[in-house]
């Protein structure tokens, strides 16, 4: 694995950890505001992002590369109403999709087919993640306060890893 690709993968590890912290911040905010179901959904997203960082690091180790965690920047803390929280989550998922696409491009430029293959799981997952958050945002916008109250309790059953 080239140094350029190792650096790009390490940047993605840091981005995944930042994403995990972002979702955790959203979770704490929603919990404090009394939306425990939504908070639980955000907790699950946080755990998923941490899992991505571990997956990338594990892949790098298998390829005899060195995973590194760089400084993880501070995430926002205040979010507004639940619709705004999920709108921000949607924009963030779109940003992550762009980062993954750029990472696939680096792997292609470096002629690393194994890494391209590894990364396609994240490309597919991002399509699903964006669609899921878009669906939530759409429902929240259409139903207004009723949907917010429904979601506040409907996601409390989620199991965390």
PLM segments and residue spans:
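Charged, low-complexity surface patches
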Residues: 5, 19, 38, 49, ...
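Basic/polar N-terminal segments that are highly enriched at the extreme N-terminus
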Residues: 1-3
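Conserved small/polar residues in nucleotide/adenosyl-binding loops
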Residues: 156-161
């Amino acid at each position: 694995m080239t140094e350029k690709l190792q650096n790009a993968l390490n940047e993605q590890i840091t981005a995944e950890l930042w994403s995990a912290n972002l979702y955790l911040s959203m979770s704490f905010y929603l919990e404090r505001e009394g939306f425990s179901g939504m908070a639980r959904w955000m907790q699950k997203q946080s755990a998923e992002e941490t899992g991505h960082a571990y997956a990338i690091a594990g892949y790098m180790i298998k390829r005899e590369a060195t995973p590194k965690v760089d400084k993880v920047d501070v995430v926002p803390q205040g979010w507004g109403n639940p619709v705004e929280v999920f709108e921000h989550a949607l924009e963030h998922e779109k940003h992550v999709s762009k980062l993954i696409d750029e990472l696939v491009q680096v792997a292609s430029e470096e002629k690393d087919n194994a890494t391209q293959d590894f990364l396609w799981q994240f490309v597919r997952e991002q399509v699903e993640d964006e669609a899921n958050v878009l669906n939530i945002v759409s429902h929240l916008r259409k139903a207004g306060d009723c949907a917010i109250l429904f979601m506040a309790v409907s996601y409390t059953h989620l199991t965390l890893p």
